């Protein structure tokens, strides 16, 4: 495990330096687009490095500027990144040649910019100041747009809620709506693999800045005792990533998180948004929510009517151009030029080009199974019908080969299923939405049969479908549960079972029982008491081809994607004591547990 963690830290450090891991241009490489207008400009380019922008508190942030050499005023595309602005060179050159000023800025406390780095904290204020600074540059025409993914998407939304007057559009990719639920936690469980690997990668630059810090010999000479002379102090781990400890200290949705929640500030967003998401991305839930809620809650008509959503397949680090994601081959249609898509949208929005964008439907999704792109009028699909698949068994749904079943028929009197959840032997993560280090079991769609073979994983499966059956939209799991512990987790996973037995994970979720009623006010459970809970499995789009089966997995862990609930009810960040829990899933007339999926006729 230690070697695995060391490898993951190295991978995380590589990923946070690599533009392809996060920006829109990598993820969106998934679709064939109409060409931009034939009259596309080709400009000679000027590149300026480390251009200073002073924030309102006097801190200087530095940016690289790529712009056309010819005199004139051009729209600005801004990216504010903690991952080193030099990684934006390729797109900067391309967009500048096409008639844009591209500004790539290191955010506060990162790489060439001054100040102290703390995740999310300064992005609204600094984003506002940078947008207005950029709009006032002598070669800017006053229109500023933003682009980029993951945290770089967060810098866009956090700037947008401050509504700087010259911000005219944003293009966020694979980013969240809430930095508590859907980023740091999900359903009350800590997103352990992502946050540990991401924080480790971020810490690399902070440690380097500390190591390179120049000490003042004259000032240092006044320090007592002599052995405390600053130059002798090597950088320590203390203070390298204070935000990580703060995340753990705030497991509930409290004031620490509310200040940063995009969901609580949609009315302050006043610009059109082109959002990119992916079915196997760690931020899928928030990406979709941003689109859905901004349509009705955006602060202006332009914002409400200007929402666009594209959902691809690949995970957080984008997808290969080969059409393969994880263990599944999705075909040659997963080929595209993502830079082209972004520029085409901004050509329409900022330059007024009639390039076809104005005629397109607002939603574009990749439908797995059929492996094709489809345009939609909205999301969720109005024609989709929420369908309940009820859980059935004779009390022995444990593992593959069990008698667990799914049916549209509600249960009568049936024996409950139970299993022992042992945190010291937790059900493992196999593929799925992961970042920012690769697990040996893969990322994205992978074969779930090794997990399904465990006795602490309940398996419920439909008969093989006689005809193609499409599930597209939000998926949820209604369960009636009890536990011998005062706190435990319940997980759910929707799976497509191929005729050869391959079990492809589609989407999944988790709920920490203490957060069954609220993310703000945890309530421990009474052992043995039955509770009705809902586990949000986020969304998917998949056609279960004829001969395939639909499967549900229910368990109490998905480790190390999520932290293990130790079942004690103690503070998770400090707890070490482990208790086994006997967890029960009820499915009878009084407790009709069901998987709810949107079936498209």
Locations of regions flagged by a protein language model:
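Active-site-adjacent alpha-helix of alpha/beta-hydrolase-fold enzymes
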Residues: 285-307, 575
């Amino acid at each position: 495990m230690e070697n695995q963690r060391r490898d993951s830290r190295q991978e995380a450090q590589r990923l946070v330096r690599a533009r392809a891991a996060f920006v829109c241009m990598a993820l969106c490489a998934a679709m064939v687009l109409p060409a931009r207008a034939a009259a596309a400009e080709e400009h000679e380019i000027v590149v300026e490095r480390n251009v200073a922008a002073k924030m309102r508190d006097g801190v200087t942030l530095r940016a690289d500027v790529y712009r056309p050499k010819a005199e004139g005023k051009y729209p600005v595309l801004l990216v504010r990144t903690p991952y080193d602005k030099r990684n934006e060179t390729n797109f900067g050159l391309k967009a500048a040649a096409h008639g844009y000023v591209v500004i790539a800025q290191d955010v506060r406390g990162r790489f060439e910019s001054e100040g102290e780095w703390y995740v999310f904290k300064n992005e609204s204020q600094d984003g506002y100041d940078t947008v207005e600074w950029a709009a006032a540059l002598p070669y800017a025409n006053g229109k500023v747009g933003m682009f980029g993914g993951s945290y770089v998407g967060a810098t866009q939304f956090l700037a947008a809620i401050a509504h700087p007057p010259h911000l005219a559009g944003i293009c966020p990719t694979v980013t969240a709506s809430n930095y508590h639920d859907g980023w740091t936690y999900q359903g009350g469980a800590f997103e352990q693999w992502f946050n540990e690997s991401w924080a480790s990668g971020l810490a690399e630059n902070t440690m380097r800045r500390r190591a390179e810090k120049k000490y003042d010999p004259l000032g240092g000479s006044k320090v007592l005792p002599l052995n405390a002379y600053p130059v002798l102090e090597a950088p320590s781990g203390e203070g390298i990533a204070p935000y990580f400890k703060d995340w753990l200290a705030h497991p509930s949705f409290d004031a620490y998180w509310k200040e940063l929640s995009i969901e609580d500030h949609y009315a302050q967003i006043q610009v059109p948004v082109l959002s990119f998401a992916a079915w196997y991305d760690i931020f899928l839930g928030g990406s979709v929510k941003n689109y859905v809620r901004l349509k009705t809650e955006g602060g202006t008509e332009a914002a409400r009517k200007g929402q666009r959503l594209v959902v691809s397949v690949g995970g957080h680090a984008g997808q290969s151009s080969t059409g393969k994601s994880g263990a599944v081959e999705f075909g040659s249609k997963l080929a595209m030029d993502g830079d082209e898509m972004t520029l085409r949208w901004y050509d329409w929005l900022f330059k007024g080009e009639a390039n076809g964008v104005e005629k397109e439907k607002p939603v574009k999704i990749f439908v797995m199974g059929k492996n094709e792109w489809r345009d939609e009028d909205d999301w969720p699909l109005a024609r989709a019908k929420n369908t309940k698949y009820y859980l059935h068994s004779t009390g022995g749904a444990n593992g593959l080969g069990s008698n667990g079943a799914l049916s549209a028929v509600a249960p009568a009197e049936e024996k409950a299923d139970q299993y022992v959840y042992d945190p010291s032997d937790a059900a493992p993560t196999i593929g799925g939405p992961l970042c920012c280090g690769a697990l040996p079991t893969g990322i994205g769609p992978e074969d779930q049969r090794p997990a399904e073979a465990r006795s602490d994983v309940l398996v419920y499966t439909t008969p093989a479908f006689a005809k193609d059956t499409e599930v597209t939209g939000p998926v949820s799991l209604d369960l009636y549960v009890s536990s011998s512990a005062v706190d435990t987790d319940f997980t759910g996973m929707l799976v497509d079972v191929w005729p050869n037995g391959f079990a492809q994970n589609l989407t999944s979720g988790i709920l920490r029982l203490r957060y069954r009623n609220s993310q703000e006010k945890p309530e421990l459970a009474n052992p043995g008491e039955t509770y009705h809970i809902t586990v949000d499995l986020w969304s998917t789009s998949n056609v279960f081809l004829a001969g395939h089966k639909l499967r549900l997995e229910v368990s109490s862990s998905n480790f190390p994607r999520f932290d293990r609930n130790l079942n004690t009810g103690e503070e998770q960040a400090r707890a070490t004591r482990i208790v086994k829990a006997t967890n029960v899933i009820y499915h009878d007339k009084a407790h009709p547990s069901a998987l709810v999926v949107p079936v498209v006729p």
